[in-house]
Each structure stands twice: as structure tokens, then as C-alpha cells.
């Protein structure tokens, strides 16, 4: 890309980005930029970030919708969970470790990319697709349904904490 200069008229006005996409997209762009290299800025980048943000929000909404009848005081113990739910918690712990280290190193772009990958690949494309039957078809007191809800609750709670510093809408 070309360098942006106000005199060339090829700059991107943050107020325009804010008005078109909202503050969260502007924050997400700033957090997802690798400041060790030239920071890219374009309508296409903001469009992609908007799509990623929508996927993140939809994933969180799906999890929240499936926790309506869930009591956080009755979490399923990991040793009582099916392998798939324990696998998700392992992946979640890996994400936590990566995010904690990235926060310590001020590498916010690593966090945004890791959370996006986790939401799109680990959750949406794999885990949530498999556990839908447990969530929709099993009884409210089913042990396997409660196990899936426990995994969703812990995941949603963690994602909101991981992104609270970056996105206002995920403030815990």
C-alpha cells in the first residue's frame, strides 16, 4: 500500500470510521494492528474487521442464548465432562495463556487474532456445531447438556474478560 498523507488526500479519518462502523471496530482495528510493521488502514480492512466482530458477537450470542436455564452455581466438574467438553476447556486454557502473555508483552494484535481464530474455528466450525443436539434435544437436567452449558458458560465468561480491555461491548 501507499503511505497515507493528508496532503495527498488518501488518509482515513477516524471520525468517518467511527460514524460508518462504530467505536468497537475502530478499537478492534487499533488493537489488531501489528505496530512493529507499517499499520495498514483501508475500507476493506474495516469491512473484514466488521465481519470478524459480527462472528464474535454471534458466537457469544449463541452461547448466551443457550445459558438461559443454566445455574452457574451448578458447574459440571471437568472430570465428569465428556471428552469433547474437556477438549474445549483445554483449548480455552491455551487461549488464556496466549492472551495473558500477549497482554504482558503489549502484543494486542496476537490476542485479537487468537480470539478470532478460537471463535471461528474452535467454537463455531467445530464445537458448537457438534453440541447443538445436546443443547436443543436433551432435557434441561441432562448431565451431558449441563456439561455443554458449563463449557459454554466458562468460555463466554473468559472471552468477555479477555476482550474487556479492548472492546467496550465485552466489558465484564
Give each language-model segment a name.
Residues 2-167:
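Long, charged, mostly alpha-helical binding arms that flank functional sites
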Residues 169-172:
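Conserved small/polar residues in nucleotide/adenosyl-binding loops
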Amino acid at each position: 500500500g501507499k503511505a497515507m498523507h493528508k496532503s495527498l488526500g488518501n488518509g482515513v479519518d477516524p471520525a468517518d470510521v467511527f460514524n460508518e462502523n462504530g467505536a468497537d471496530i475502530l478499537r478492534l482495528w487499533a488493537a489488531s494492528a501489528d505496530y512493529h510493521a507499517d499499520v495498514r488502514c483501508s475500507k476493506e480492512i474495516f469491512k473484514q474487521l466488521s465481519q470478524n466482530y459480527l462472528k464474535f458477537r454471534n458466537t457469544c450470542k449463541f452461547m448466551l442464548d443457550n445459558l438461559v436455564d443454566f445455574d452457574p452455581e451448578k458447574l459440571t466438574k471437568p472430570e465428569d465432562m465428556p471428552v469433547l467438553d474437556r477438549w474445549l476447556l483445554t483449548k480455552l486454557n491455551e487461549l488464556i495463556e496466549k492472551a495473558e502473555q500477549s497482554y504482558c508483552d503489549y502484543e494486542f494484535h496476537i490476542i485479537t487474532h487468537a480470539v478470532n481464530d478460537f471463535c471461528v474455528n474452535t467454537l463455531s466450525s467445530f464445537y458448537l456445531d457438534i453440541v447443538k443436539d445436546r443443547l436443543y434435544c436433551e432435557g434441561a437436567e441432562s448431565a451431558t447438556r449441563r456439561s455443554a452449558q458449563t463449557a459454554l458458560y466458562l468460555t463466554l465468561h473468559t472471552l468477555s474478560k479477555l476482550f474487556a480491555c479492548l472492546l467496550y461491548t465485552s466489558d465484564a
